[in-house]
């Protein structure tokens, strides 16, 4: 009986720890990870290069070591890193599938990889996770972000998405990701040419953002 109990205990402990797979990313059991490989044939015959190794290494390092990402790893069900000849966007978070996708491209470097991770994972993925696990702080951030001008011109595209009395729209979500860029990188790669939030308003959003990211 004692041997059975010890065996059972070891099994439970292992299942609660994230482990590195052959891909090098520290994930929990049943998290799907795909890193694209080179396919032969050249562009004219649908051949595709593998993602640049330095970009892959940077993504792996961020996911494995960043404390903001480690908090929500159980929330991430899939990670895809691939290369494409042309792209509409280099990164995305699919909230329905809880899936992060990174698309490498000739013009993308390791700094771009950082910014995309900050925007998509520490921004969008964390915002979705916090709705359940940091709901008081999540609601407070959204109420303030909803009443503020957009952080940058990219967020301004979502102004029409704002709704009075609602704090769970794409506008607040994008405000959160924009603040994530500022907090993590010290700057945003999006412009501020239009009617955007003042420095004081951004500082107020940063304050409540940090309250949600304890």
Question: Can you say where each PLM-predicted feature lies in the sequence?
Answer:
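Arg/Lys-rich, intrinsically disordered low-complexity tails that mediate electrostatic binding
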Residues: 1-24
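Active-site-flanking segments in enzyme catalytic domains
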Residues: 28-59, 70-214
């Amino acid at each position: 009986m004692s041997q059975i109990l010890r065996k059972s205990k070891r099994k439970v402990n292992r299942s609660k720890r994230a482990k590195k797979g052959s891909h090098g990313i520290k994930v929990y059991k049943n998290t799907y990870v795909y890193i694209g490989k080179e396919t032969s044939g050249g562009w004219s015959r649908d051949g595709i290069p593998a993602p640049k190794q330095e970009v892959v290494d940077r993504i792996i390092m961020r996911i494995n070591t960043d404390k903001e990402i480690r908090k929500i790893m159980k929330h991430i069900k899939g990670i895809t890193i691939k290369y494409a000849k042309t792209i509409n966007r280099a990164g995305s978070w699919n909230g329905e599938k809880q899936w992060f996708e990174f698309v490498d491209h000739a013009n993308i470097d390791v700094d771009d990889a950082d910014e995309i991770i900050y925007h998509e994972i520490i921004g969008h993925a964390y915002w979705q996770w916090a709705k359940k696990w940091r709901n008081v702080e999540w609601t407070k951030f959204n109420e303030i972000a909803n009443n503020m001008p957009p952080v940058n011109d990219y967020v301004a595209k979502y102004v029409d998405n704002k709704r009075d009395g609602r704090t769970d729209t794409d506008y607040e979500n994008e405000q959160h990701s924009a603040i994530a860029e500022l907090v993590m990188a010290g700057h945003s790669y999006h412009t501020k040419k239009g009617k955007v939030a003042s420095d004081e308003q951004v500082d107020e959003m940063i304050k409540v953002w940090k309250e949600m990211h304890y």
